[in-house]
Amino acid sequence: MPIRALCTICSDFFDHSRDVAAIHCGHTFHLQCLIQWFETAPSRTCPQCRIQVGKRTIINKLFFDLAQEEENVLDAEFLKNELDNVRAQLSQKDKEKRDSQVIIDTLRDTLEERNATVVSLQQALGKAEMLCSTLKKQMKYLEQQQDETKQAQEEARRLRSKMKTMEQIELLLQSQRPEVEEMIRDMGVGQSAVEQLAVYCVSLKKEYENLKEARKASGEVADKLRKDLFSSRSKLQTVYSELDQAKLELKSAQKDLQSADKEIMSLKKKLTMLQETLNLPPVASETVDRLVLESPAPVEVNLKLRRPSFRDDIDLNATFDVDTPPARPSSSQHGYYEKLCLEKSHSPIQDVPKKICKGPRKESQLSLGGQSCAGEPDEELVGAFPIFVRNAILGQKQPKRPRSESSCSKDVVRTGFDGLGGRTKFIQPTDTVMIRPLPVKPKTKVKQRVRVKTVPSLFQAKLDTFLWS
């Protein structure tokens, strides 16, 4: 139940929920409100009477003893009168509310009208400002045009006077003596005439100086052109001499080309002779060796590499170490071997030792690279040799030997040029009886070149597969 007293700071009634404090002047407030007042006020004064207050003069809490109120007996007439009074007050409040609402509506309408008026005035103001800025720009432009017009008039007046003076000077320069004297007489006497004559004299002097400078510049240009002409003639003579030298070099190059064509024809003839020699009997094997030795190696042939047809890696350092005794050249081949030693820088033949197969063998075998093949030679090794060697191996008749007879291969595998500009491997037996050529076919009138296709190895890629021209 609230106490019928209130705090002047917060305007709230005192109750038992909050503490009530008092000051020595007698005024009471909520304790929390009084503390907040002291914290925010510039000085510690009473909120109501404004006297100075100290901390010790504040009573922090007051206690009130309230008695129980007696219940009043209410009368019906009293209640009816109270109800009528309340209804009258309510109707009065409603009337006041309606009047206030009418006033509010009127004020709202007035406010809307004022807002519309303000908007229209703002639009009019914006248009006026835009018109004003446009007029200012036009005025500024007109002022600028007026200034330009004045400047143009001054420039025109100055140019007219200058043009008149220039016409008189031009007439003075181009006219004869009588005309000049007549023009001077027309000028009259006086200060202006003297000034005009002075201007004419100065102009004539400047023109004379300009003519002198132009003549000097023309002389310098003429000297420069003469020097350029002399240097151009010397350069032309140099070019002519270089042209003659180029013609001589062209002739020498044509001669070299003709000699190269002749060399090609001779190589073709050697090739034809080599192919014809392949069909000779065994006694003519020395001719084959001679042609192979006489075939020069191409010195300036730049071979290009391409990928091999197989993915197997090729060991270029692989050698064939075979305990094969060196073969003694025959008396007929001794001359060619001496020639080979003398022309070592041009000779393409290199000895490569080859392994041999030791032990008895039942049938005729070829011992190449440490592999023994009964009946037929190895296709991989046969494909690595030239045509005449393959023909000799394929057409060789293997003599039958007894099983108890043991033989060792005395063949030597050599590497040399095949006569066509490339390298190849071939077998050179110590015994010429081991290599037998194919049987000689009867010659026909029309010679046909037989091309034997080499069988590529199916097991290992060869170095020849990397080379292409």
Swiss-Prot record:
One of its GO terms (biological process) is protein ubiquitination. Its EC number is 2.3.2.27. The keyword Translocase does not apply. The keyword Transmembrane helix does not apply. Pathway: Protein modification; protein ubiquitination. It catalyses: S-ubiquitinyl-[E2 ubiquitin-conjugating enzyme]-L-cysteine + [acceptor protein]-L-lysine = [E2 ubiquitin-conjugating enzyme]-L-cysteine + N(6)-ubiquitinyl-[acceptor protein]-L-lysine. Keywords: Chromosome, Coiled coil, Cytoplasm, Disease variant, DNA damage, DNA repair, Dwarfism, Intellectual disability, Isopeptide bond, Metal-binding, Nucleus, Repeat, Transferase, Ubl conjugation, Ubl conjugation pathway, Zinc, Zinc-finger. Gene3D superfamilies: Zinc/RING finger domain, C3HC4 (zinc finger). It is an enzyme of class 2 (transferase). It comes from the Eukaryota. Residues 211-469 are annotated as: Interaction with CYLD. SUPFAM superfamilies: Prefoldin, RING/U-box. It holds the Pfam family zf-RING_2. A motif (PIP-box) lies at residues 460-469. A zinc finger (RING-type) spans 7-50. Changing residue 127 to A: Abolished sumoylation and localization to the nucleus. InterPro entries: TRAIP_ubiq-protein_ligase, Znf_RING, Znf_RING/FYVE/PHD. Changing residue 80 to A: Abolished sumoylation and localization to the nucleus. GO terms for molecular function: identical protein binding; ubiquitin protein ligase activity; ubiquitin-protein transferase activity; zinc ion binding. There is a cross-link at residue 304 (Glycyl lysine isopeptide (Lys-Gly) (interchain with G-Cter in SUMO2)). Residues 70-177, 201-280 form a coiled coil. E3 ubiquitin ligase required to protect genome stability in response to replication stress. Acts as a key regulator of interstrand cross-link repair, which takes place when both strands of duplex DNA are covalently tethered together, thereby blocking replication and transcription. Controls the choice between the two pathways of replication-coupled interstrand-cross-link repair by mediating ubiquitination of MCM7 subunit of the CMG helicase complex. Short ubiquitin chains on MCM7 promote recruitment of DNA glycosylase NEIL3. Interacts (via PIP-box) with PCNA. Binds TRAF1, TRAF2, TRAF3, TRAF5 and TRAF6 is part of the receptor-TRAF signaling complex. May interact with CYLD; the C-terminus interacts with CYLD, however the interaction was not detected with the full-length protein. Interacts with POLK and POLN. Interacts with UIMC1. It is linked to Seckel syndrome 9: A form of Seckel syndrome, a rare autosomal recessive disorder characterized by proportionate dwarfism of prenatal onset associated with low birth weight, growth retardation, severe microcephaly with a bird-headed like appearance, and intellectual disability. Belongs to the TRAIP family. This is E3 ubiquitin-protein ligase TRAIP. It comes from Homo sapiens. The gene is TRAIP.
